[in-house]
Amino acid sequence: PCCGVSTLEAMAWQASEFSGIVCCAMDARRSQVYHARFLAENGTLTRLCPDCAVSLDEGRLALENCEKPKIMVGDGAQLCYNTFGTEISGCMLAPEHRRMQRASGVALAARRLLSEGADCSGAALAPNYLRLSQAERERAERLRTSKESVNG
């Protein structure tokens, strides 16, 4: 069996024994993070929002009104924690050995997907990009600018 697994969800499984909100953050540069939140209870995760790219301010807003304990994981966790984590009640940084994605997290996320019947063939696997790459954004801007020049 084969299934596509969210890197953010795989990271969240590193903190599944935590009781509260697992905030996953991968540094997306330009003061943004790839972000997802999960409720961790009794060794299971419940997704609270889809994977998305958000500004650091949006990340702060997503957590500051939540009363449950919060733990940050991912390579953007330190950035988020340094930017706003110390100002949010009940927010902590996961220990380094639990902060990054591991094969075990991918396996746990895949097990959940397989139990829900979300398997596919290897040929059907495709990446799920949350935003265009810098080269794609610059190309789109050049095309838009050249189109505006032609149209007057």
Q: PLM features: residue spans?
A:
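Acyltransferase
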Residues: 94-152
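Surface "functional belts" at beta-alpha junctions
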Residues: 1-101, 129, 134
